[in-house]
A protein has these predicted regions:
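Short hydrophobic core segments
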Residues: 1-12, 22-24, 74-80
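General beta-strand structural signal in soluble alpha/beta enzymes
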Residues: 3, 30-33, 186-189
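Glycine-rich nucleotide phosphate-binding loop and flanking beta-alpha elements
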Residues: 8-10, 84, 94, 204
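A short secondary-structure junction signal
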Residues: 13-15, 88
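Gly/Ser/Thr-rich active-site loops/lids in small-molecule metabolic enzymes
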Residues: 19-30
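An anion/pyrophosphate-binding glycine-rich loop and adjacent beta-alpha core
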Residues: 28-32, 38-167
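A glycine-rich dinucleotide-binding beta-alpha-beta segment and adjacent secondary-structure elements
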Residues: 147-205
Length: 205
């Protein structure tokens, strides 16, 4: 049996789901269509001001404590959430109530979170009189640095210095850079999706 009627992705090209309706009208079992290979919508507050920034990252969709799927590659921040090939590969698992875990430490050039933490303490000691806002200079762009510090609940002012960073602050920033959790609100619709998930239940043919 060959079924090649298309899904619902890119409806402007003619993919309107009519093949699935034909199958279900004939009594053939099918699973619901859903957008896949598309952008993920997240809470906008944690990523405010980051639109247009690209980073190397490892991303994973988390349901409670279970990792449903993970990828690594280039991530693109947007006003609505995140995009990039690695993100789009995770989209079929992204549902409201789940979390998108973003790890940036390897993309910054570190082997693991421990090495990132040690670099923070090295900079605290050697950059003691430099502004705290410059702590991540050379590791990420200033807008991303500020967002990570906000997410780690740092209170950075113009007078804050790198030497004032405490061990607890370093730990919170390390956890954020290694496992930044963004609440998922959904995915972009079929207009943005490259493919469709769901369709004819092949196990029943």
């Amino acid at each position: 049996v060959i079924i090649s009627g298309g899904g619902c992705a890119q409806p402007k090209l003619g993919s309107d789901g009519s093949a699935l309706r034909l199958l279900t009208n004939l009594g053939c079992p099918a699973t619901p269509f859903a957008p896949a290979l598309t952008q993920i919508i997240t809470d906008s507050a944690p990523i405010k001001g980051l639109s247009g920034i690209r980073v190397k990252a490892q991303v994973a969709v988390i349901d409670r404590k279970s990792v449903l799927h993970e990828e690594d590659g280039e991530l693109l921040f947007a006003d609505y959430g995140v995009s990039g090939v690695c993100v789009m590969q995770c989209a079929r698992y992204a549902k409201e109530g789940r979390m998108l875990r973003v790890s940036l430490v390897k993309g910054m050039g570190f082997a693991d979170a421990g090495e990132f933490r040690r670099e923070l303490h090295h900079r605290r000691k050697n950059w003691a009189q430099r502004p705290m806002a410059e702590l991540l200079t050379g590791l990420c762009v200033p807008r991303l640095s500020a967002a990570l510090m906000r997410q780690a609940d740092w209170r950075v002012t113009e007078s804050s210095l790198c030497g004032q960073m405490t061990a607890d602050m370093a730990e919170r920033l390390t956890q954020t850079a290694d496992a930044w959790l963004l609440p998922i609100r959904g995915v972009k619709g079929f207009e943005s999706a490259q493919v469709t998930s769901g369709g004819a239940a092949v196990a029943d043919f």
